[in-house]
Structures are given as C-alpha cells and as structure tokens.
C-alpha cells in the first residue's frame, strides 16, 4: 500500500519541508509515502472563490490514483485517537488499495473532493494552518505505523 498526501499549496516554509521530509524518510519501503502539491488558485478581493475551489478540487482528484481510497482531512470528519488511527492503517493495508489523503486550501475542500471521499478524518476541532497539517499527518501516520509494527517510536 502506498500513502499519498494531496495538498493545495506549493510554496511551504522551510520548517514545513524539513518536518514533513523527516517523517517521510522514516516510512518503510513497503509503505511509501509521497506528496502531490496542487497549485493554489489566485485569491484577490474579486476572486471567484467557488470557481477556485472547483479548480483545486479537479486538480486534486486528477492527482489521485484511479482506485485509491480517498480520505479528506476536514474539521467535521471523524477524530481518531492514535490507537484508532493504527487500526485504520491496518484496515487500509488489508483493503489492498493505495490511500490518498486530501488537504484543501484556505477555504477548505471542494465539494467534489468531499463527495469522492470514502472517509473524512478530523485532526482537531481547531482550524489549523494547512502547512502545519502536512507535518501533523505525516507524524501521526508514522506513529500509527510504529504501533502496528511494535516499533519503539510510540510509547503509551
């Protein structure tokens, strides 16, 4: 199974790149984790936000593999504690499909992305900066993997 993070935004601060890559490199070869960055639509005071969201959504869904399980990251999604995320990861592996996790832009996810999702995951009831979400998702998935393999990274 391959994990894919599909995120709106291409110019992340160095600390985001450093943090994300740190966890990315820790994943084992049998569970590769990749990032697909989607250019954010131009936002200005006269921007058509609905159209921008639609375009970002089209690009996000185009980046997802044909049979991938789509999981959106969204505040109203299901919150998973770390052991629950580890169980999810095991279920995803047993399913046999690759998993694409979608992070929207400043206005969130396009309705088409939400409609295509099989699951929606809420990291927190807080609104988080989207660059930070990349690092949190990578760390959370690495921690979940460590639980499923009895790796010493996670401690109770």
From Swiss-Prot:
One of its GO terms (cellular component) is cytoplasm. Homodimer. S-adenosyl-L-methionine binds at residues 73, 104, 123-128. It is found in: Cytoplasm. The lineage of its organism: Bacteria, Pseudomonadati, Pseudomonadota, Gammaproteobacteria, Enterobacterales. It comes from Yersinia pestis. Its EC number is 2.1.1.177. Specifically methylates the pseudouridine at position 1915 (m3Psi1915) in 23S rRNA. This is Ribosomal RNA large subunit methyltransferase H. One of its GO terms (molecular function) is rRNA (pseudouridine-N3-)-methyltransferase activity.
């Amino acid at each position: 199974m391959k994990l894919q993070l599909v995120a709106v935004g291409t110019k992340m601060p160095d600390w985001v790149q450093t943090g994300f890559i740190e966890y990315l490199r820790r994943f084992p070869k049998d569970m590769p984790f990749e990032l697909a960055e989607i250019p954010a639509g131009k936002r200005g005071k006269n921007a058509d936000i609905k159209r921008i969201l639609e375009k970002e959504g089209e690009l996000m869904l185009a980046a997802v593999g044909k049979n991938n399980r789509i999981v959106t990251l969204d505040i109203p999604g299901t919150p998973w504690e770390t052991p629950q995320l580890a169980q999810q990861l095991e279920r995803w592996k047993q399913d046999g499909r690759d998993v694409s996790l979608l992070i929207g832009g400043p206005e969130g996810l396009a309705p088409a992305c939400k409609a295509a999702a099989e699951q929606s995951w809420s990291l927190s009831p807080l609104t988080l900066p989207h660059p930070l979400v990349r690092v949190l998702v990578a760390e959370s998935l690495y921690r979940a993997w460590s639980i499923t393999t009895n790796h010493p990274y996670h401690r109770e």
